[in-house]
Amino acid sequence: MNSVTTNKMTNYRWVICAMLFLATTVNYMDRQVLSLTWKDFIAVDFHWNDNDYGTITAIFSLFYAFISLFAGRFIDWMGTKKGYIWAIVVWSLGACLHAGCGWVTMYVENIGSIEELRNIAAGSQAAIAVSTLSVWLFLACRIVLAVGESGNFPAAIKVTAEYFPKKDRALATSIFNAGASVGALAAPLTIPVLAEHMGWEMSFIIIGGIGFIWAGLWLFLYDKPSNSKFVNEAELAYISQDEGEAAAEKEETKANEPTLSFLQCFAYRQTWAFIVGKLMTDGVWWFYLFWAPAYFSELGYPSSSGMGQALIFVLYLIVTILSIYGGYLPKLFVEKLGQNPYAGRMRAMLIFAFFPLFAMFAQPLAHISPWIPCIIIGLAGAGHQAWSANLYSTIGDMFPKSAIATITGIGTMFGGLCSFAINKGSGMLFTYADGLGDAFSFFGQTGKPAGYMIVFCYCAVAYLIGWVIMKALVPKYKPIVLE
């Protein structure tokens, strides 16, 4: 029951949007702790190589993809409030558990001190045992993290559909989706400092603990718009302005589960269009997220150095500033040109798909200055974030509210498969290329730089290919109509 009685429209929907932004920021900071500590801290202790790290990130992506199949259904069944709390508590717990991997490894291998651990001869049986055990322990923690984190975007997209009319959803999604960039932006300024001064273990514990605070705030602040004491009638009317909104709300209230079964979702071309958009492009962002610190370290600027932190910070600053405009362009097409939301989003996504093409020039120009690949990857990442925000919003354009989280989970699963392939493939490729040295070449690059060149080329063209396939599957606006 709404308790706000003023005639002036409240703007509580933006408070909720801010909470989604904070959750996504925490989500990505938890995910970034490993990428910012493995090369300079953890690998030194546990004798990891690129392939070991690639395995950990790939398995995380695989489980993230698999659990995403059920995360959307879980959010639909549990409800947004409880479901979101469960998700963030689980992933925060998983983040904190990473801190114990070193202690368990030392205990099992009967190693008495950090100095003894680091002084183990590289390539020895003891080093292999330490590396293998620690990788398995980190994998277990990453799986717990993946289980919780897989619920973030299905829940956030469902909340956006509940609190925003269709014309504003891309903007709201752009704002909370920018939390990914802000989380990645804040991470290099905080995590290496924590790891340097307090140990890499405390960086996992401190960053992971923030999620528990968010869960307490969500418990107090969130309720459905029609039940929220902070939303007045004017704002509720604005939220429900779309045709058929009221009827959909009533049907959703009556329903105990999505009106589309899991298998029925795959019968629609709209589902496959969303799947293709995620399958082609999600792994690109995850590659930038997981490998950018290691890439700059290869250029001679580790994340523990001031220059390394500056490069990563500026990269994600570019992403953050530019990606926030991802929701404005389709809104302009809808309001100024009179296009339907889907057509406006697809036109905007085509424009955003050209930004990642810059990635092809990151490696060839890296010898001039590290700032060149920094700026290029930032532009490509901004294009991804703008693309992703609009891609998520196409679900609300096409599907009934009750199925939004399920469709989001399906798409996220396929996006996770792309991330698995890119991260595992990258780790194997970089280790292989590094071993061959000058004997491995691609487009004028040799050794490990040639490996990076190969991955950057895929990152560059993935969006245009994905857009063409999506357009072929759903050429015109066609929402799902259930009989």
Residue ranges and their predicted role:
Residues 32, 61-69, 150, 184-185, ...:
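Residue-level signature of mid-helix packing/kink "hotspots" within the transmembrane helices
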Residues 34-36, 265-324, 384-388, 392, ...:
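Extracytoplasmic gate region of multi-pass secondary transporters
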Residues 84, 138, 346-349:
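Primarily marks hydrophobic transmembrane alpha-helices of the MFS/SLC 12-helix fold
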Residues 89-131, 350-367:
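C-terminal ends and interior cores of transmembrane alpha-helices
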Residues 141-182:
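Cytoplasmic helix-loop-helix junction between adjacent transmembrane helices
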Residues 180-229:
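Helix-loop-helix hairpin linking two adjacent transmembrane segments in secondary transporters
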Residues 214-222, 226, 357-365, 452-483:
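Multi-pass alpha-helical transporter architecture, strongest
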Residues 342-390:
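C-terminal transmembrane helical hairpin of 12-TM major facilitator-type secondary transporters
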